[in-house]
């Protein structure tokens, strides 16, 4: 189980990303449209003034049940070992154990 503080930090990052998403996207579009270098530097400065944690690259997917940050499957939102346990217990519909 991940520390609760790390999970809360990730939730805070998600809120910041949602809050500044439109500002960030519009600034990036403006940079591509402006031909002058000085104008690009000005808009780049605005981007730099936004909070660091509001960037989408700072977000990290976590396991829904344990909060584990590694080996997550997007389809289920679970980490690998929890996914395996749930499939073995027949708790995930449509997921079957592989056999060959």
From Swiss-Prot:
Compartmental location = Plastid, Chloroplast
One GO cellular component this record assigns the protein to is: small ribosomal subunit
For this UniProt entry, the molecular function terms from Gene Ontology, in alphabetical order, are:
rRNA binding; structural constituent of ribosome
User: Mainly resides where?
Assistant: plastid
Disulfide linkages recorded for this protein, renumbered to the chain, are none
> InterPro entries per the record?
Ribosomal_uS14 (IPR001209), Ribosomal_uS14_bac/plastid (IPR023036), Ribosomal_uS14_CS (IPR018271)
Q: Keywords in UniProt for this one?
A: Chloroplast, Plastid, Ribonucleoprotein, Ribosomal protein, RNA-binding, rRNA-binding
Transmembrane annotation, as ranges: none
GO BP field? translation
The superkingdom listed in its UniProt entry is Eukaryota
Q: Which SUPFAM superfamilies match?
A: Glucocorticoid receptor-like (DNA-binding domain) (SSF57716)
Q: Does the keyword Protein transport apply?
A: no
- Please give the HAMAP family that the UniProt record associates with this protein: Ribosomal_uS14_1
- Similarity section: Belongs to the universal ribosomal protein uS14 family.
Q: How does it assemble?
A: Part of the 30S ribosomal subunit.
The task this protein performs is described as: Binds 16S rRNA, required for the assembly of 30S particles.
**UniProt protein name:** Small ribosomal subunit protein uS14c
